[in-house]
Each structure stands twice: as C-alpha cells, then as structure tokens.
Curated annotation (Swiss-Prot):
Its EC number is 2.1.1.174. Gene3D superfamilies: Vaccinia Virus protein VP39. This is Ribosomal RNA large subunit methyltransferase G. The lineage of its organism: Bacteria, Pseudomonadati, Pseudomonadota, Gammaproteobacteria, Enterobacterales. It catalyses: guanosine(1835) in 23S rRNA + S-adenosyl-L-methionine = N(2)-methylguanosine(1835) in 23S rRNA + S-adenosyl-L-homocysteine + H(+). It is an enzyme of class 2 (transferase). Keywords: Cytoplasm, Methyltransferase, rRNA processing, S-adenosyl-L-methionine, Transferase.
Amino acid sequence: MSHVDDGFRSLTLKRFPQTDDVNPLLAWEAADEYLLQQLDETEIRGPVLILNDTFGALSCALAEHSPYSIGDSYLSELGTRENLRHNGIAESSVTFLDSTADYPQAPGVVLIKVPKTLALLEQQLRALRKVVTAQTRIIAGAKARDIHTSTLELFEKVLGPTTTTLAWKKARLINCTFSHPQLADAPQTLSWKLEDTGWTIHNHANVFSRTGLDIGARFFMQHLPENLDGEIVDLGCGNGVIGLSLLAKNPQANVVFVDESPMAVDSSRLNVETNLPEAFERCEFMINNALSGVEPFRFNAVFCNPPFHQKHALTDNIAWEMFHHARRCLKINGELYIVANRHLDYFHKLKKIFGNCATIATNNKFVILKAVKQGHRR
C-alpha cells in the first residue's frame, strides 16, 4: 500500500492492477505532490480538469472540487475509482472523460501529468485550446527527466508562454498561460499503408507504434494460424492489425478487439470499417481491463502482444493478468498465442499458468509462444 500526505488530505493509495509485495511500485509520485502544493494558496474558480491521473492521487485529493478526470486509460479510471472508494470518497465526486471527448468550458484549473507520448500530449493540448481562457491556471508535472525541450515547445506552440520550475524530489512543473497563438489544424489520426496489403492503418494519438508497424507485430503476423472458427480475441489490440489479419485469414471466425485504451479500440474499429467493411459484422469492440467480466469458456483462441510497461513504469503485472484472464475465458483446448521479447521469459510463466507451453517461432529478438487450456485445469 502506498501513502501520500498533502495539503488537501491524507490518502491511502494503491496501484491497479496491484504490484507484488516483493517489487512494489508506488501509486503516486513526487510530481503529484508538487502539483498539489501549487494549489495550496489558490482560490479555485471554475471547473477543475485533471489529465492523465494514473491512479487517482490528484482526483482523490481534489475530490471536493468535483474534478473532471480526462485520459485514455480504462485501467487508470478503475484505479481512481478503487482509490476513491478506499478513501471513503464518493465515486460521483469525479467525472471521467475520454481524451477525445469535449472538455468543459472555461476551466479554472488544469493539471496535466505529462504523458509518455508527445502525440497524446499534443492531442490533449489542442483539445484544451478550445476551452481554456487566459485566466485558466495550467500546470503540468512529470519527472524532471521526462520534460524535454520538445515538451516545452509543444506547450508554447499550442497554448502560449511556458516556463518551468526548479526540480523538487526529481520532479519538475510546467506553467503555461493561454495566449491563443496561431496554430494550423491537425488530422485526428495518423495513417500509413500496411506493407504487402491494400490496407491503410489509422492511428489515434495514444496508439502504440502509431507511426508504423512495430517489429513484434510484423513477426506475429507472419505466423498467425488459419482455419479458425468461433470467437477469437485480439487482446491488447492497439490499432487492430493483428485482429485485421485474423479476420482476413479466418473467414469463419468472429474477432473481439479488446484494449484498455479507448483510442486503441476506436482505431481498431476504424481500421475494420475502412479496410474490411464486409467483415465488420464479425467483430466486437471492447474497452476493458483485459477480459474482466467476460464469461469463462467463451473463446477458441486468444492472441496477445502484451505490454511490459504501465505509463513510465516497467512491470509484467498487466501481462500476468492478461494470461490468467485468457486461461479463464478459453474453451477447453482453446489456445493462447503471444509474441514477446525473448528476454521476458514468458515461456515459464505460461507453463506455470497453463501447465504447458510451446515455441511456435523465434528470431533474434522475439518469440511466439502457444499455450493450450487443458481439460483438467480449472
């Protein structure tokens, strides 16, 4: 369990999913404390917008102001809701919005946890540009090492004059004043042609490897099985290229695209609509924490390129959760296929969970593994 004391209240916070006790990761960071310190003497007038509040430290601390929590992570929303409940704060105190939603007009305060990707930051700053005023207090925070010249230039370009604070506990803040600088329009998605197909892949701002096909997915696509039927899953679908390939290779199968990022799920939907419209009726699109709440014994196969980081933190907790959810939701003799970096040693992890694991293909960087749900394992 992680604790944070600040000028607003004392909170008990935990990550979501929880990390193990051997290598615990905190549910808050110095940048959260630093941001809250800046508001100690501030009279807040107008809506409070909080962007990219990973586990709800800011939302819980500012709950009395009925903030809007804006981001592109269903896991973050679940974590924030859990921490609100755990601290005896009504979940209704916080309004949750996707990054692509319309933001409330004329906010009094905007707090931004600087995201990992500049593309997401730019999308969010452009959305803020439509609603903030010169009187809106705009403060962003991150580890000092994660604030670069390009970060500051982006604030200047989209919103206006920008300054930084001194570092405190290895965190730094960005202060910005809206001045309505001239700014050219930008497309909502980035698109590129997928090699060896006639497909155009559309990517929202927060989609993994949005500028081109990542090498792990390329390797995975070379070894996807054919002649599958029933329901199969692209788990952690991103822009949906794996699911698209499965749709094309398996005309008797229905594909469920699942991701915790609303932008990823929307990108997958858009890519099916524009590239395989005739297959759209064979698709389901789901924003979810892996396969939480999905009935057991439903799927014939699950395909997964699991992440090994959550925001800036390295962790295999999400991958572990995906593997356990896959086993629960697979039919007997159903198969889980994954692609992963070789150094992660998922072979032994899958063998521990499923009781078996086979190597389908390998190269100098990646490995494709298959585990089968056996009848005697519940």
